Curated annotation (Swiss-Prot):
Protein name listed in UniProt: Nucleotide-binding protein RHA1_ro01989
Cellular component aspect of the GO annotation: cytosol
NCBIfam families, A to Z: PRK05412.1
One Pfam family named in its UniProt record: DUF520
An annotated Gene Ontology molecular function: nucleotide binding
Keyword field contains Metal-binding: no
InterPro entries in the record: DUF520 (IPR007551), UPF0234-like_C (IPR035571), UPF0234_N (IPR035570), YajQ-like_sf (IPR036183)
Lineage: Bacteria, Bacillati, Actinomycetota, Actinomycetes, Mycobacteriales
Length: 163
């Protein structure tokens, strides 16, 4: 019997983030407490999102609105790395970026976790910014998935190409 395998990746559907961004922008423009505060949210580049507002409190409230929209669209908050609010003139700005791909350091942590606590006979290989996990038994692969879901590696993990 051939080996079964799956890939562990950390990717975000950009269209879903775009939808969440537009929903948050619409809410910022219509909500009463955001009127005349200059609060806005927009893309700045391919992977960066910028929030602006007149006060730091309104900026953080706008960030909460955006995070709420991400959660509603089933996007993990670990996939969005929000920076610190910075003041430029009379406007406060906050830039955040999307976190995609598994770094080599995180991939090594995940493979070590699988080797130490996973079922015997399970192999994990680092392939660029993803991880291939293979085994002869599918039950072992499901045990590895539940093991990884129960652990926090600081990034959003997805399990794809299960075969």
């Amino acid at each position: 019997m051939a080996d079964s395998s799956f890939d562990v990746v950390s990717k975000v559907e950009r269209q879903e983030v775009d939808n969440a961004l537009h929903q948050a922008g619409k809410e910022l423009s219509t909500r009463f407490d955001f009127r005349n505060t200059g609060a806005s949210i927009e893309w700045s580049g391919e992977e960066t999102i910028t929030l602006t507002a007149d006060t730091e409190e309104r900026l953080l409230a706008a960030l909460d609105v955006f995070k709420e929209k991400l959660i509603r669209r089933d996007i993990s908050l670990k996939a969005f790395d929000a920076g610190e609010p910075a003041q430029s003139g009379k406007i406060y700005k906050l830039s955040g970026s999307l976190v995609q791909g598994i770094t080599t350091e995180n991939a090594k942590k995940i493979t070590k976790k699988i080797r130490d606590e996973g079922p015997k006979g399970v192999k994990a290989q680092i392939q660029g910014d993803e991880l291939r996990v293979s085994s002869k038994k599918r039950d072992d692969l499901q045990a590895v998935i539940s093991l990884l879901k129960g652990e926090d590696f600081g990034i959003a993990l997805q399990f794809v190409n299960y075969r």
